[in-house]
Amino acid sequence: MTQLINVNSRSYRLSSAPTIVICVDGCEQEYINQAIQAGQAPFLAELTDFGTVLTGDCVVPSFTNPNNLSIVTGAPPSVHGICGNFFFDQETQEEVLMNDAKYLRAPTILAEMAKAGQLVAVVTAKDKLRNLLGHQLKGICFSAEKADQVSLEEHGVENILARVGMPVPSVYSADLSEFVFAAGLSLLINERPDFMYLSTTDYVQHKHAPGTPEANAFYAMMDSYFKRYHEQGAIVAITADHGMNAKTDAIGRPNILFLQDLLDAQYGAQRTRVLLPITDPYVVHHGALGSYATVYLRDAVPQRDAIDFLAGIAGVEAVLTRSQACQRFELPEDRIGDLVVLGERLTVLGSAADKHDLSGLTVPLRSHGGVSEQKVPLIFNRKLVGLDSFDRLRNFDIIDLALNHLA
């Protein structure tokens, strides 16, 4: 078996112990802190003694797909190409959903590990990520969302519902993430993969603030699984795809800037196009509202004028040109607009008011997407060495850290 693999200009030492990398969707660090303070996460609390607790930056836009793909490629979106759920194809003049693996421009560490002879397992909460994360992977790969459709031929495992002892959970539930962890434990005990990647959903974080009973119960559940993985002898590495913040005013009303309406009023209809890369089929979570938007300008709209106009709107943190955004956030130039707009911590960006269904938001809006959700945990159940070689820790360094930097 190959002991070293090279993927996207980085080298990875193959582990001799089962290694589990966990992406906790929407894990603002305060969730962990509050759960520990409430006595709900005793295993995580102990990691300061025998593990390593660090903080890193996620990819901006701080959304699920760009960050999960960065983690499994060890590279930013400028390399792997996935910079949101949607992009505007200038050739076809259509908004394109990027859930298909054909939009992935780089190999994954997971697929390369499997090619090197390792048993690799991937369990995601939502099925939208499975095709991307499982691209060219010969191993185990399935989602909790469609666990009842798992087959040995397509997914590398079977009878997962019976093994886990849970029914298929609702997409809009904490149970969807618990299914991921329970399935991971079953795989660890029975198949004992060399490497496992577990990715949850941020349903709880979108609905419940850090320290609330619901949030603490969710983190207590995860903590119990982390402990069981540790007791099974696994190397456990935990990070997040992004943080999470309230996007409301003082009395809980959503702070939304409908950029398409504002731009239409300023320049006229059909002169600009606002695209929200957070948009996905699961809008109940966030109403397709996040703190990042990209804007396409027609020829008649001067770029400098549009920048000044958008930057002058209260709640807008920054407006960047395409080249500025690609340089600062390492994004693919052909998949973002002429401008990138970032909302402040308490503000989300929409397109037009009539394009957003907010009826599913039964609690004050919480979302992500901006720089304000960039800080994420990097937590390990082992001591690490050689960290001086990192100028800046990123969530997509986690596989490198787990495989190459154990003491």
Curated annotation (Swiss-Prot):
GO MF annotations, alphabetized: metal ion binding; phosphonoacetate hydrolase activity
Known EC number: 3.11.1.2
Role this protein plays: Specifically hydrolyzes phosphonoacetate. Does not have activity on other organophosphonates or acetates.
InterPro entries documented for this protein: Alkaline_phosphatase_core_sf, Phosphodiest/P_Trfase, Phosphonoacetate_hydro, Phosphonoacetate_hydro_insert
Name this polypeptide is given: Phosphonoacetate hydrolase
Residues that coordinate or bind Zn(2+) 2: 202, 206, 368
Encoding gene (name): phnA
Keywords: Hydrolase, Metal-binding, Zinc
